[in-house]
Amino acid sequence: VKKLDTKHNALGNLICVNDKGGIVSPVVEKEFIKEIADVLDIEVIQRKVAGFHQVGAVMKANNLGGVIHPEADEEDIKNFSNVLGVNIEPATINSGIPYVSSGILANSNAVVVGNLTNGPEIMTLTRAFTN
C-alpha cells in the first residue's frame, strides 16, 4: 500500500489502471506519476478522456478488456488500448450513462453492473470484458 501525499482524495475517479498499464488525469501532480508507475509496476500516461479530467469515472478496465466514454475519439481509444494492453470499446451503463465506472465493478473473473443496464449495453460489456 502506497499513500500519495496529494490534495486529491478521490483517486479512483482520476485514474484507470489494470495489471498492464494506467491512464492518469492531468490534474494529478506530475511528481506522483512515477510513484504510481513504480508501485504498480506498470506504464502510466497522463491524458484527459473525451475532454474529462475524471479518467477513472469515464473508463473501466480489467486485464481482459475495457470500456470508455462514448465520446472518446478513436485515436485516444487506440492509445489507451496500447497502454492498458487490452481492447477498449465505447460504451454506456445503466441505460445511457456515459460515466461507465459509476455502474460497473470489474476484475478479470467477472463484471457486475447496475440494474438499469439494458440488453444492448450488457452485450457491449460482455464483448468488451471477455476479449
Predicted regions and their residues:
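The feature marks the mature, well-folded catalytic cores of soluble enzymes
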Residues: V1-N131
